């Protein structure tokens, strides 16, 4: 079928007439993707309304900004890719919170807690990889790249934890705000204990989402290789080792959101209280 493709009725195909002779290019497969994208946008707008619209705007801005930085790296290879992705990580977090709450209402606690969690997990992961000399990691699936594939993989580690970390930070800090608002007399110990209970519920589910999101992309290849007689351990190393590392790095980022959220919440609360005291004096 690779040399003589078989078509069914109602299949859409792409043709080329540049040589004044119609030639088959490939099947047109983007129709289903378009339907899914439109359905997703419609659901977001229908369920979340105005906030959903601004969330989509934030996603669009983040995608455009990422492509812009990658274009810069493509035009000038002397600029370090990891530096560009580090800049993108910070800006993407600010854009995400800004489109949700408005640029004038950006919550510095959430921004700083997310940045702290993502970069801390990234540094721990990269240091561990360096100490172990990347043992057990198989880069075969990305060796076709025309640039240092390890650098590209490290960049993907940094990007992988942004969304999940930001979600967890928003949930924890917003919950703590509600607790303080409804129970002003609550002390720090009780606040932290309540925050831990909230975090324990959200963190596990976030890590599970991250796990299945990463592993699902490699599962078809994993099954295909096993069906063709490959050894299970060898197949696992080749197709899942990098995904497992991404899950671990993202999982660490999610876990670090718990102490970082408490840290910046209590720090800003203390600064706010101190500011009010100074005003009274």
Where are these regions (language model features)?
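Hydrophobic alpha-helical transmembrane segments of multipass membrane transporters and ion channels
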Residues: 62, 116-121, 154, 158, ...
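Short juxtamembrane and helix-loop transition motifs at transmembrane-helix boundaries
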Residues: 15-25, 40-52, 71-79, 178
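Pore- and gate-forming transmembrane helices of large, multi-pass membrane proteins
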Residues: 167, 185-222
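Hydrophobic alpha-helical transmembrane segments of membrane transport and translocation systems
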Residues: 46, 201, 213-281
């Amino acid at each position: 079928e690779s040399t003589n493709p078989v078509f069914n009725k109602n299949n859409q195909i792409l043709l080329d007439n540049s040589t004044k002779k119609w030639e088959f290019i490939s099947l047109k497969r983007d129709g289903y993707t378009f339907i899914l994208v439109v359905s997703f946008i419609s659901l977001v707008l229908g369920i979340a309304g105005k906030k959903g619209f601004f969330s989509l705007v934030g996603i669009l801005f983040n995608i455009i900004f990422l492509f812009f930085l990658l274009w810069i790296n493509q035009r000038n290879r002397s600029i370090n890719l990891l530096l560009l992705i580090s800049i993108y990580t910070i800006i993407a977090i600010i854009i995400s919170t800004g489109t949700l709450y408005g640029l004038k209402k950006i919550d510095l606690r959430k921004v700083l807690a997310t940045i702290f969690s993502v970069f801390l997990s990234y540094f721990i992961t990269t240091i561990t990889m360096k100490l172990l000399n990347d043992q057990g990691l198989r880069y075969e699936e990305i060796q076709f790249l025309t640039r240092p594939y390890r650098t590209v993989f490290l960049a993907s580690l940094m990007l992988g934890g942004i969304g999940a970390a930001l979600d967890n930070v928003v949930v924890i800090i917003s919950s703590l705000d509600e607790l303080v608002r409804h129970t002003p007399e609550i002390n720090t110990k009780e606040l932290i204990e309540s925050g831990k209970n909230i975090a324990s519920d959200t963190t596990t589910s976030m890590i599970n989402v991250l796990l299945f999101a990463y592993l699902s992309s490699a599962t078809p290849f994993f099954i295909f290789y096993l069906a063709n007689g490959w050894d299970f351990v060898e197949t696992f190393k080749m197709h899942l080792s990098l995904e497992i590392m991404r899950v671990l790095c993202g999982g660490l980022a999610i876990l670090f959101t718990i102490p970082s959220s408490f840290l910046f919440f209590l720090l800003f609360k203390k600064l706010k209280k101190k500011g009010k005291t100074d005003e009274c004096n």
